[in-house]
Amino acid sequence: MPAELKLLWDEVRLAFADVDLILHSGDIVHPMVLDQLEAWAPVVAVIGNNDVYVRDDRVALTQWLDVDGFRIAMVHDMEPEDEPIDELRRKYLRGERPDVIVTGHTHYERMDFRDGVLQVNSGSPVHPHLWSTRLGTVALLDLEPGSLRAKIVKLGDTEGRRNPGVEYTFDGSTVHPLD
């Protein structure tokens, strides 16, 4: 892991300090990233377009999870993200209906609630908006039976490089941008 990335990694670790599961939405680049994340919590991941050298049983093109009564679908690239949910389901999820869709690819954070589906792109913790290495954003899902909450949080600023991220919260029915 590059030294510059190691300096940022502590902020990522703090953000995931109390999580039960880590969902990685692709652009893993190297399996050691999964190894590091797995030291903190179990990891479920999807393959990204920058993962040509990642050959790992923990990674798939699409992942489906059932957590506390909620169905979560993960896929790296689901563009355009603002297409109707039914069209995204048809094109990327074989028509299956999740409660939550977790995506990546753009490195731009996004949270939307449409047609009863929460759509989350966490951005990137260390390469936000495809800028040079710096702190960015992560998404946190809080799932309990009958209750779904989510937020996208900024990890801070890297010295000399601002964090371009936008924070969001989801209270179970509405997404609120915080910036």
Describe each PLM feature range.
Residues 1-4, 29-33, 50-56, 79-85, ...:
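Active-site environment of divalent metal-dependent phosphoester hydrolases
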Residues 22, 27, 37, 48, ...:
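Divalent metal-coordination and catalytic microenvironments
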Residues 44, 83-151:
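Conserved beta-sheet core of the metallophosphoesterase superfamily
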Residues 76-77, 152-154:
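Residue-level recognition of conserved beta-strand positions in structured domain cores
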Residues 83-87, 131, 158-168:
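A short, polar/proline- and glycine-enriched secondary-structure boundary/capping micro-motif
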Residues 147-149, 157, 165-179:
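Non-catalytic terminal accessory segments
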